[in-house]
């Protein structure tokens, strides 16, 4: 089954090259929802992922309930596996278990932190190879507390 990522963005030209280079290898398709960016974000997406869709958000502010509804509406336009990620998130894992049956999996989050402001990074290397300090949440904690992400192949209501 096809895997589609949905991502909202606003002026993310700094982080988008890492997000796109990484996730284009994981997902078959992407839908990038532009919250009226004024930087080069759209051009970067077109350059690095020319087959991905870029849509202008129907929202003019970033209210959680409106964002969630818009993402659900976009996800429902596609068959297969769907996942929403922020531009700061990189999906890492083995997804060979994803089959053709409707299902949902919760994927725990990993947060990358680097307190060394002097460390220079380049878009030519994966970010996780340059920022090597991170942490995960205890696997026994509630998924909502851990900010887990859902990859699913079922329609959302």
Which residues are covered by each model-predicted region?
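Active-site beta-to-alpha loop of glycosyltransferases that engages the nucleotide-sugar donor
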Residues: 2-21, 36
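Active-site-proximal specificity loops/subdomain of glycosyltransferases
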Residues: 3-4, 18, 40-85, 93
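Gly/Ala-rich phosphate-binding loop of Rossmann-like dinucleotide-binding domains
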Residues: 24
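Short beta-strand/loop segment that forms part of the nucleotide-sugar
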Residues: 28-36, 56-57
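Hydrophobic residues within beta-strands of alpha/beta enzymes
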Residues: 30-31, 82, 108
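Active-site acidic Asp-centered loop
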Residues: 35, 85-87
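Catalytic-site signature of metal-activated, phosphate-bearing donor transferases
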Residues: 64-76, 91-157
């Amino acid at each position: 089954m096809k895997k589609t990522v949905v991502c909202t963005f606003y002026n993310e030209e700094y982080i988008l090259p890492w997000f796109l280079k990484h996730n284009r290898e994981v997902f078959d398709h992407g839908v990038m929802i532009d919250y009226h960016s004024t930087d080069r974000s759209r051009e970067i997406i077109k350059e690095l992922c020319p087959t991905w869709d870029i849509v202008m958000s129907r929202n003019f502010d970033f209210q959680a309930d409106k964002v969630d509804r818009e993402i659900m509406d976009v996800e429902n336009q596609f068959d297969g596996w769907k996942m929403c990620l922020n531009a700061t998130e990189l999906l890492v894992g083995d997804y060979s278990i994803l089959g053709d049956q409707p299902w949902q999996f919760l994927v725990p989050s990993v947060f990358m932190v680097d307190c060394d402001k002097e460390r220079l990074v380049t878009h030519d290397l994966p970010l996780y190879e340059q920022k090597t300090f991170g942490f995960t949440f205890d696997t026994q904690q509630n998924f909502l507390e851990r900010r887990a992400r859902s990859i699913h192949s079922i329609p959302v209501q």
